[in-house]
Amino acid sequence: NAHLLAIAPNASSSIICGGTSPSIEPYRANVYTHKTLSGSYQVRNKYLEKLLKKKGLSMDTREKIWKDMAIANGSVQDIEVLSDEEKEVFKTATEINQIYIVEHAHMRQEYVCQSQSVNLFFTMPKATESQSVHDEYLQYVNDVHWYGMNKLKSLYYFRSDAARSAENVNVKIQRVKLEDVECLSCEG
């Protein structure tokens, strides 16, 4: 066996395996809507759900927290019942300093036979932000990529949230039946 360990891009595989984390990637959000051929449903971070239950919060309070998180794009940073340490644990992919993602990939690289599919996550500043904020963002993106270039064999995707996004006017989940346009065997 020439290769003993490879890390594939596993977003689809994580869904098939029942909502596990997407391999080496951090979660994009703690709550999000997953759309499939059979409809849409809300996916929640099961570890965060356990923590909220452990805190003894009522079902109504927990549901309000999930709704607030959905409005905040899956972020827990404004959830008052969580400690600062808990907020650190449940940061979304864009809230994590991307240098850490590169550093972790660098540390595990010697144990991986092939190159890793390392994705980086950024949130662009809003168009209304000052020029200095935009300059800092560009410098940060540049610094992370230079750091990655010197530490890793390659980087895979640059994922960014849009500078402008539609208002989240309704977080209610709507079931939509999608047309079966592709072979179901090819979905994985």
Language-model features and meaning:
Residues N1-H3:
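Short acidic, Pro/Gly- and aromatic-enriched capping/linker segments at domain boundaries
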Residues L5-K177, E187-G188:
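Catalytic alpha/beta core of large soluble enzyme barrels
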